[in-house]
Amino acid sequence: MPRVVFIDEQSGEYAVDAQDGQSLMEVATQNGVPGIVAECGGSCVCATCRIEIEDAWVEIVGEANPDENDLLQSTGEPMTAGTRLSCQVFIDPSMDGLIVRVPLPA
């Protein structure tokens, strides 16, 4: 079972177990990680589950798909190679130890 560490600058670290195939949004909301609002429930239409994948994990997690990228760009927030929507990142065994930053609310 992969372990994921969510880091929230206000609340601290949350190290939680995840199931293969779960989205990071599901993992975060099921474990009470603050900052993942997920208003649309994972439909990739609201961008309220925005996260930053730590640099060392970007290649393993992969890039945003075109729809996700368009939605992220529409927010006007600065983006990095690790900017993703947690509803669009699905856990697999290679992600054991994944570190995810949850941005402060705007």
UniProtKB/Swiss-Prot annotation:
Its cofactor is [2Fe-2S] cluster. Coiled coil: none annotated. Keywords: 2Fe-2S, Electron transport, Iron, Iron-sulfur, Metal-binding, Transport. GO terms for molecular function: 2 iron, 2 sulfur cluster binding; electron transfer activity; metal ion binding. It comes from the Bacteria. GO terms for cellular component: cytosol. Residues 2-106 form the 2Fe-2S ferredoxin-type domain. GO terms for biological process: P450-containing electron transport chain. Binds 1 [2Fe-2S] cluster. [2Fe-2S] cluster binds at residues 40, 46, 49, 87. PROSITE patterns: 2FE2S_FER_2 (PS51085), ADX (PS00814). It holds the Pfam family Fer2. The keyword Metal-binding applies. Belongs to the adrenodoxin/putidaredoxin family. The oxidation of alpha-terpineol by cytochrome p450-TERP requires the participation of a flavoprotein, terpredoxin reductase, and an iron-sulfur protein, terpredoxin, to mediate the transfer of electrons from NADH to P450 for oxygen activation. This is Terpredoxin. It comes from Pseudomonas sp. The gene is terPB.
